[in-house]
Amino acid sequence: MEYMDVKRAAEVWLLSERRITALCRNGRIVGAKKSGKTWMIPDDTKKPLDGRTREYASANEQDASVAHTTTRYTTEGATGKVVDAFENTYLRAPEHVAFTPYRICPIGAHSDHNLGKITGFAINKGIHIAYGPKQNGVIEIASLQFPKRAQWHVASTPSVKQDDWADHLRGATIALNKRYPLRTGLCAIVDGELPIGGLSSSAAVIITFLSALSHMNGIKLTERELIDISMEAENQYVGVSCGKLDQSCEVYCRKGHLLYLDTKDDTYELIPQHPSMKPYKIAIFFSGIERTLAGSAFNMRVDEARSAAYALKALAGLPYGKFNETNLRDVPREIFEQYKDKLPKSWAKRAEHWYTEFDRVQKGAEAWRRGDIEAYGKLSFESGRSSIYNWETGSPELKKLYDIMTETDGIYGGRFSGAGFKGCCMALIDPAYEDAIKEKVTREYLAAFPHLEGKYSVHICESADGVKLI
């Protein structure tokens, strides 16, 4: 049998020598043998299929001559990046890669925490986690966005926040362990494709991690369980009073469909793109300023909306029960109209946004159903305006982006994406105007905020399916 050394294999396979050495050391290349300081690999070892994919031969642990299985991953883009990082960190190939898309919500913002309705999409950018098992129950995970590797045990996860990037994942471990006994840990690398802020990267990383951890423990979670456990981690451990908009979009969504969800009873519909609808793409305009949701005024806005509901019930003589179980969905619109002048101004504004957004969501779903993307886009612009004047969010940067979008040809509609304090704006655009839109928005935005050049960015995306194992 003829052999080639690691250097030659690297040239032939277009892989790094370090990666090939790691694969040999961990028995991932059948027939490889140590020779001095290098490894020798059989010449007939299966090579990459093409420039986009590669294969790793996994030898049977007891007998390397037994027929092997293969794990294939893309070598380009985000999947290849996280796989490379895993191999360079743990000196072996990952067993699996999980992916959860980011989400956008053109209409329905700030509604879910008061049991409103929402519309949304998943997009074809998101969070990847490359992972493999650790039989000792330890979770060891590193992020390509943050320094310092995090580590804890599935049976003794810290019960309080550690105030670092991995808190979302600790909370997810605790929430999952309440429902199912966890014995197997994992080693993992997590990577996000876009800057942080406005696309629900926090929910996406939790869902991706839960998919990986449950998979390693032989647990098959339903879509509803995945949403509920993810939301519990963010609410109870991280301390963010979010609803289920983010998680639902990232789990339920399907490419080419609009998610129409009622967060009161969790019923939803995936409305397909009408055959006569004009073409569209999704543009993400990052302001260049990132934000941390739990440290923002997000929770205060949620409390103000709930306070409005509680006060309206009291003013109308309705049973109002516990404060944390009160929501605007249980208060008829006519009661709000009758008593809104008696509410503190900020409370009335929060409620005004919620009720008008509820109407916009229903109108938007019908517009999408009949293929009228221009009407849907107009409602998204109205949603953005209400977020500024009634929900009272929006940094100077996001407000400027919003104003530019409303005056740009080829943009059907858009608004802040996410909480609306920093982060990004999203827009539904006519692909025929893509280049002109990018040029105009970029030029006018950087003219207003020249110090953000190099931080501001534009990304053109498409709708996508929800969470999946690759």
State the predicted function of each range.
Residues 1-19:
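Polyanion-binding surface elements
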Residues 14-40:
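Major-groove DNA-recognition helix of helix-turn-helix-type DNA-binding domains
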Residues 43-68:
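A short, Lys/Arg-enriched interface patch at domain edges and termini
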Residues 65-103, 107, 128-162, 257-415, ...:
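C-terminal nucleotide
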Residues 122, 199-219, 426-430:
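DPxDG-like acidic metal-binding loop motif
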Residues 140-142, 185-192, 221-234, 377-382, ...:
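Beta-strand segments within the central parallel beta-sheet cores of soluble alpha/beta enzyme folds
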Residues 178-187, 213-229, 431-444, 448-452:
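Phosphate-handling active-site elements
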Residues 220-268, 417, 460, 464-465:
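Alpha/beta catalytic cores of group-transfer enzymes, especially the acyltransferase/condensing modules
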